[in-house]
């Protein structure tokens, strides 16, 4: 679309509510997300909330779920589904203190089945929280200055930032901006305090939501900050990504990338993953006006009729990248500068010990699929609690579901190392390169969207793939593999070298050819297949890779060069 052409506005916020989707009416009539949530929480007859309140509660980081392992049995017994709630914390950049960790641990043991989950967007999730415990959990988070606002819903979600801030002054500066961006973009409604803290409603002089208005964003909107050479946050998967540009170790500004998004629907070919497009560069002091300008374009022009078509990536591909850039610049009042050079060389976490420029040390631990839990042979949750009781630095959740024990003085390292060994937290030293670069979403039994297993299945599948790797001498080679229980892509499977997305119980789509640094989408290799076909395909392709790869060539690059899949140049061609 030509930048001067006025785009079609038949599906955006300019239209009357009755011309748009039902979710828009729900938001508009919710009294800024209040709905009837208080009444739903007070209803002791059911362990659930109403369908409309469940949608509104997403804006407060809460998903209503049920235990699908026993859903059919409860239905046969004519019982209500075993409802519970997932609660996600707002934690920009993934940073928390030992005191906060200890409180999170306590809340998980009291209200969430003795487990805590680290997410792919650098935060914590509590699962299996009962309705009557929601307020207690959220008020417990308030005690440690945390909340769950905008962790889900049609808003900014969690703001990501490359870890580890204390490895350099640049990291610290960018993390501080990411934290400010989260506070800057979070919704302003007083509903959160009224519902969860049981506060009185406060009168406001101006609009309750001066930026979002009554209908908020068309869909989720994700923001992330990357610091080259690390692309650990998968900046190209963000709706709005900022790539830090430094000069002599100091932050100069950011390249601006827009339109990333990895969700799709198998039955809808109009949906596809898309990598963000870099549209220019801004000086650091232009960051917050740029956030407002880009978000406001999506707020005003995003599709509010069809939620499958409502993400920013579709707005960009429909209106045209040139028009979107021009409209952003019009709202900014200045033109973006040309993109600055940068290079990404890694996407995963450097596990183990690293010393920062200030002399402090940091240890990145492998947390398989982000699940912090005690098992008979691995008391991980107890071990991390023991470390938090003596640690004087910070904890940092990584975008790969791992955990960094950060800011350790050299004199304190032996004590931390001893606890790691005592509780088996140093096992990353004996794991395969594939397992250390693996991720899985939660999926069954709690996620209502899952079509197949993910977190509960991937570790066993990896053991079988590791036998193949061992055969070909590839055990230590870093290869990214990501699995999700549905096509929505929470674990970012479409930019993995090996991606698996659930289609039905025991059945998955197999994707190959993603970029090791997160710079390229993969492509479907096999559709709707079970474990035998997956292992056979990986035996063939990995064996070929071991024999014929070029020096330094990653598996995803080889899969394309060898002709197993074609390179996906743009997201809209993903389904071709």
Curated annotation (Swiss-Prot):
Protein's name according to its UniProt entry: Sulfite reductase [NADPH] hemoprotein beta-component
Keyword Metal-binding: yes
Family listed: Belongs to the nitrite and sulfite reductase 4Fe-4S domain family.
Catalytic activity of the protein: hydrogen sulfide + 3 NADP(+) + 3 H2O = sulfite + 3 NADPH + 4 H(+)
Listed cofactors: siroheme; [4Fe-4S] cluster
Binding site for [4Fe-4S] cluster: 441, 447, 486, 490
Compositional bias per record (Basic and acidic residues), positions renumbered to this chain: 1-12
GO biological process: cysteine biosynthetic process; hydrogen sulfide biosynthetic process; sulfate assimilation
Cofactor stoichiometry and binding remark: Binds 1 siroheme per subunit.
Recorded GO MF terms: 4 iron, 4 sulfur cluster binding; heme binding; metal ion binding; NADP binding; sulfite reductase (ferredoxin) activity; sulfite reductase (NADPH) activity
Role of this protein: Component of the sulfite reductase complex that catalyzes the 6-electron reduction of sulfite to sulfide. This is one of several activities required for the biosynthesis of L-cysteine from sulfate.
HAMAP family: CysI
4Fe-4S listed as a keyword: yes
Gene from which the chain derives: cysI
EC number of the protein: 1.8.1.2
Species the sequence originates in: Nitrobacter winogradskyi (strain ATCC 25391 / DSM 10237 / CIP 104748 / NCIMB 11846 / Nb-255)
Pathway listed: Sulfur metabolism; hydrogen sulfide biosynthesis; hydrogen sulfide from sulfite (NADPH route): step 1/1
Residues annotated as binding siroheme: 490
Pfam families assigned to the protein according to its UniProt record, in alphabetical order: NIR_SIR, NIR_SIR_ferr
GO cellular component: sulfite reductase complex (NADPH)
Binding partners and assembly: Alpha(8)-beta(8). The alpha component is a flavoprotein, the beta component is a hemoprotein.
Region spans: Disordered: 1-26
Keywords per UniProt: 4Fe-4S, Amino-acid biosynthesis, Cysteine biosynthesis, Heme, Iron, Iron-sulfur, Metal-binding, NADP, Oxidoreductase
Main EC class the enzyme belongs to: oxidoreductase
């Amino acid at each position: 679309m030509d930048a001067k052409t006025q785009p079609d506005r038949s599906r955006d916020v300019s239209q009357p509510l009755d011309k748009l989707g039902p979710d828009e009416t729900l938001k508009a009539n919710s009294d800024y997300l209040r709905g009837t949530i208080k009444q739903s929480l007070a209803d002791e007859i059911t362990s659930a909330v109403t369908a409309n309140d469940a949608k509104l509660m997403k804006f407060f980081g809460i998903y209503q779920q049920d235990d699908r392992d026993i859903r059919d049995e409860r239905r046969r017994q004519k019982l209500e589904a075993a409802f519970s709630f997932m609660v996600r914390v707002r934690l920009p950049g993934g940073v928390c203190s030992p005191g906060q960790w200890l409180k999170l641990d306590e809340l998980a043991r009291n209200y969430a089945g003795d487990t805590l989950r680290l997410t792919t967007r650098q935060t914590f999730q509590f699962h299996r929280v009962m309705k009557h415990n929601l307020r207690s959990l959220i008020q417990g988070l308030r005690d440690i200055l945390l909340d769950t606002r905008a962790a889900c819903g049609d808003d900014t979600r969690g703001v990501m930032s490359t870890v580890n801030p204390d490895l350099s002054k640049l990291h610290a500066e960018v993390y501080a901006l990411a934290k400010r961006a989260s506070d800057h973009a979070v919704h302003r409604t007083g509903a959160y305090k009224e519902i969860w803290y049981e506060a009185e409603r406060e009168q406001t002089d101006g609009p309750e939501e001066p930026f979002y208005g009554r209908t908020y964003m068309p869909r989720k909107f994700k923001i992330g900050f990357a610091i080259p050479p690390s692309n650990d946050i998968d900046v190209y998967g963000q709706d709005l990504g900022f790539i830090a540009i430094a000069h002599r170790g100091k932050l100069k500004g950011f390249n601006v990338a827009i339109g990333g998004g990895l969700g799709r629907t198998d039955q809808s070919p109009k949906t596809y993953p898309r990598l963000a497009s870099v549209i220019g560069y801004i000086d650091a002091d232009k960051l917050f006006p740029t956030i407002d300008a880009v978000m406001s374009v999506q707020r005003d022009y995003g599709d509010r009729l069809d939620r499958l078509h409502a993400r920013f990536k579709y707005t960009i591909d429909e209106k045209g990248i040139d028009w979107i850039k021009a409209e952003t610049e019009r709202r900014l009042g200045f033109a973006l500068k040309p993109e600055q050079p940068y290079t990404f060389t890694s996407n995963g976490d450097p596990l183990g010990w690293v010393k920062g420029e200030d002399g402090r040390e940091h240890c990145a631990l492998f947390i398989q699929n982000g699940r912090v839990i005690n098992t008979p042979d691995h008391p991980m949750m107890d071990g991390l609690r023991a470390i938090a009781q003596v640690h004087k630095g910070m904890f940092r959740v990584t975008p790969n579901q791992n955990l960094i024990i950060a800011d350790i003085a050299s004199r304190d390292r032996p004590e931390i190392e001893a606890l790691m060994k005592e509780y088996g937290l140093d096992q990353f030293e004996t794991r395969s390169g594939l397992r250390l670069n693996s991720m899985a979403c939660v999926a069954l039994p709690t996620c209502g969207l899952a079509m197949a297993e993910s977190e509960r299945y991937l570790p066993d599948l990896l053991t079988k793939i590791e036998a193949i790797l061992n055969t070909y001498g590839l055990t230590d080679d870093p290869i990214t593999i990501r699995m999700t229980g549905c096509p929505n892509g929470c674990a970012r499977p479409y930019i993995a070298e090996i991606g698996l997305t659930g289609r039905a119980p025991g059945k998955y789509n197999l994707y190959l050819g993603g970029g090791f640094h997160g710079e390229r989408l993969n492509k479907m290799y096999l559709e709707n297949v079970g474990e035998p076909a997956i292992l056979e395909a990986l035996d063939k392709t990995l064996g070929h890779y071991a024999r014929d790869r070029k020096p330094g060539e990653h598996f995803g690059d080889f899969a394309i060069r060898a002709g197993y899949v074609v390179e996906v140049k743009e997201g809209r061609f993903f389904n071709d």
